[in-house]
Amino acid sequence: MGVISMKKYIKNIVAFIISFILMAVLLMTSLTMFFRGTILNSQTYIGVLEKHNIYNQIYDNIYSNIHYLLLSNNIEENTLDGVISIDEVSEVVNDYIYYTIGYMKNEAMDIPKIDMSVYENRLESIINKFLSENSMYLNEELKDNIGELEGTVLDIIKSDLEIINLNELSKSKGMNMIAKVSAIINSGPVIMGLLFLVIILIGMISLIWKKRKARKFAWIGYSFISCGLIVFLIGFSGYISGFYNHVAIAIPYLAMAMTFIIKEYLLKFTIIGCLILFIGICFMSIYWRYLYKKYSCVYKDMS
């Protein structure tokens, strides 16, 4: 093997290693951007809830349980209508999304509890009005029964608005650790550092092939296409598999919300993969154009 051939061989080996590292860094960058732009983006969840009428389903479930409770106690089912509105349901759920995202970004120490005082006061007002309109005497037994009824109604509202006690969960060591890691991944310096590393690696490939400029676009293109294919195949294969349609959650509206959120994750991941693939193809097209011109000239000379 001649000296020139050996140099070319070493260049290809070094370029391959740098190209592989570039692919890995691009993969980490795309995952970080996905985490920041999709998982820690409140609009991802609010958009799904609005699009698929999850707020209405929560609202309907609350009143369905309240109506059942009232009927089982021989009370007209619409007696407590108005204790909570659809706007309040969406407001509370959205606030919980904002609080949770803020906690995961390490912007808050914990996730606050739901303020039930508004519903307690409103429920008490509705019950007092009902007693007054029906001229009912409030003895000790009735008072105890009403207190028990109020407690059950408030539990129904709270359990549908807060399926998981995020306030208690946010105080656990495990969740605190997850929040800290999440905040690091989401931080600007991490993303800027990865992008800077991408630029450095592209610069190194350009330096290796400074005399053969077309070749550098090929190696850079390989990195982007490899990364894009990995991201695309993970997202697309998950999306078409439909595994998210079999989420084992007993609460129908929660299962539906989780299904569409996972579907949204996979769709966004697929789109990211397509964008990276497109960038890779753009780099490769420069190399392909060079090859086309080169071999076109060869064929012309031969003819």
What is each residue range found by the language model?
Residues 263-303:
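Generic detector of multi-pass transmembrane helix bundles and their immediately adjacent loops
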Residues 249-266:
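Short, membrane-exposed interhelical loops at transmembrane-helix boundaries
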Residues 1-5:
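Short, Lys/Arg-enriched N-terminal segments with co-localized hydrophobic residues
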Residues 34-38, 237-250:
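Membrane-helix interface motif
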Residues 58, 204-208, 265:
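Buried hydrophobic packing residues in well-ordered domains
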Residues 7-17, 189-241, 287-302:
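Juxtamembrane interface at the cytosolic side of transmembrane helices
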Residues 176-199, 267-275:
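N-terminal membrane-entry
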Residues 16, 20-181, 196:
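Cytosolic/nucleoplasmic, non-transmembrane interface domains of endomembrane
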